[in-house]
């Protein structure tokens, strides 16, 4: 059985492991291997500890916890970044990662449904997120969850390779 709860500081190592392994699994063939190979759980955990303890943080972190296994998924959401041209009332899912061996088992869906529930309770009326172009599994997942591409794109550079992200939105 898997349940969703707020992330706490004791979850940082597990969340970093999920995030790093999630990146390495989801983005193989999309993001340069040199970038993926350089990612470490230790470095990610150090950044996450610093970020998690930041005063005034407006983002929310959720973990999916499997009985007998601990955290197996992580989602972070909140208001759009400062200066983002989003309509009033929009929230953003910043990240969603599931342990690679549990992709397709409903863990991601549980996290996303809980995030949508909480976003509505916090007054958001829509949710946006960014998906790496070519990440077909993620695109299908979000489309099945009611998200649609809204035409906005942004570029990110990984080891001198420019990759495009697509923005997806849905009403809450």
Q: What is each model feature region?
A:
Residues 6-12, 16, 20-101, 109-114, ...:
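Acetyl-CoA-dependent GNAT
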Residues 1-3:
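Extreme N-terminal starter segment of soluble prokaryotic enzymes
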Residues 90-91, 125-140, 144-172:
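C-terminal "cap" of GNAT-fold acetyltransferases
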Residues 106:
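Conserved G/P- and acidic residue-centered "switch" motifs that form tight phosphate/ATP-binding loops
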